[in-house]
Amino acid sequence: MIRPASWRAARRTLASASPRSIPISATASLFCAVFPPAFDGIGIADSWFWDGCENGIGEIVRSAIDTLARAGAAVKEKPLPEAREAFAVFSEGGVSAIELRAFLDRELPDWLATIDPVNVPALNNAETLSAREYLTRRFRLREAAKSAAARFDDVDVIATPTVMITPPVMTEDEGPERFWARNRAIVHNLVPGNYLVLCAATLPVGLDRLGMPVGLQLIAKGGDDERLVMIACAAERVLGTPREILGAPAMCKD
């Protein structure tokens, strides 16, 4: 099980050697030492996760991966083609809308009138979704998840940008179509982790050209949550903490 953020925050208060202040050769030894036994390395995701990155996001994430490689992590290209199928199912409506609609109809019918307008079309479409289509989507996801699990036979994690775009400015008069178009862009690299029954951690690794945070996502096989946390913590020791990389939030500065 992934430990809560408070655990990680407390963990960083413990005294430890900083690999950013010692020779790179020693850094490599430390980096290897803090990883779990038999660490298989980091895979770099295929172009589906990178094409369309805005404002230098892709370059910043690749630079972070290069830093981990120089520190001793084994790195190689690792495609995850099942991500395309997962995102296709998501774009078709996924399975959550019909499951939510069924739950509301059964347990909280009065809540239907209070649903946010941007979510109304999805719930209305779910009302007419056939059982055959729902089961077909579940089958497609199950087969894709089974295939995706095998991609981790020779790597522990697959690295991608967390979000490919700079956070958009949201407006109050934004309609459902524009909202969902932006939403799809925001969750593009996140959907595969959920739909393929994987787990993931994200680390801030810099600021894009508009000064917004950029994340490095490390995706691991489902059930490898503890191992993923260990790897993410090791990567953070090399790359730096969020405060070291991003600085203090503007509203938190004295």
Language-model region placement:
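Short, surface-exposed loop/helix-turn segments at secondary-structure junctions
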Residues: 91, 135-136, 167-187
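Short connector loops at secondary-structure junctions
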Residues: 74-89, 123-124
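Acyltransferase
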Residues: 55-79, 105-110, 134, 138-155, ...
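Short helix-loop capping/hinge segments that flank enzyme active sites or metal/cofactor-binding pockets
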Residues: 39-41, 76, 94-146, 161, ...
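Structural helix-boundary/capping segments
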Residues: 1-51, 62-71, 135, 146, ...
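Short glycine-rich, flexible loops that bind phosphorylated cofactors or substrates
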Residues: 51, 166-167
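Short, Asp-centered acidic motifs that coordinate Mg2+ and/or phosphate
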Residues: 5, 156-158
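Small-aliphatic-rich amphipathic alpha-helix that forms the alpha element of a beta-alpha
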Residues: 149, 180-204
